[in-house]
Amino acid sequence: MQDNNQKSIASAILIVGILIAGAILLKNGNVNSPAVNKPISKTIGLNVKSFNTCLASGKFKDKIQTDIDSGVLAGVNGTPSSFILKDGKVVGIIPGAQPLEQITKQIEDILKNEKTPLTTELRPVSSDDHILGNIDAKIIIVEYSDLECPFCKVFHNTMHQVVEKNNPNVAWVFRHYPIPQLHPKAFHEAEATECAWEQGGNKVFWKYMDKLFEVTPSNNGLEESML
């Protein structure tokens, strides 16, 4: 029964996610990105030399792989894939890049009504995670994302709105899920966000990632020299 439930969750995330995300991009067209004329690390004020040393070292490969492995165990097989937690238990999923209005309805429903927890092997949220928002929020949304995924780029902006609109009831956890078959640059970019974290903690991690999503054209369009 547990395996069947996990497969159902994974299928829902993949199929519905593709349909919704595709519809959003068809409606909005290509996601525009500003011209990049200097590395993100320099733009946000990092020590560029230390950043580049970190990035070349590969020291965060295991950390990113741990995120990927946890996503696979939870049933993730596409991005973005998100799980809604209440009291530490998974009570809903957000398949793909759903719009703000739909996510808000889900949140309101979960806050008002008791939900039967879903059967999934999602790794519990811990201090090792990158969290945005109130750490004591009633609801935590755990997202698995690929930094070169165009759907993830759209959803990243949506999730910022979700946290802002529902503060202090909702927090956002970001976990890496680069898909090398589609976006071979995404894993290295994930390492870059962790190197930013190394210099400035959680706040700088989010600042770097926000800028990366802002400037990347997606689908491997960001040059490595601009990290």
Regions found by a protein language model. Give the residues of each.
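Short active-site neighborhood of thiol/selenol oxidoreductases, capturing the structured segment around
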Residues: N134-C149, W172-H176
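Extracellular/periplasmic catalytic domains that process cell-envelope and extracellular macromolecules
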Residues: L73-G78, G133-A137, K165-N167, K185
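Typically the conserved alpha-helix immediately C-terminal to a functionally engaged Cys/Sec
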Residues: S145, F151-N167, P178
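A generic local structural motif
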Residues: I68-D69, S126-H130, T158-M159
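Short coil-to-helix leader/linker segments, especially the first N-terminal amphipathic alpha-helix
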Residues: K115-P124
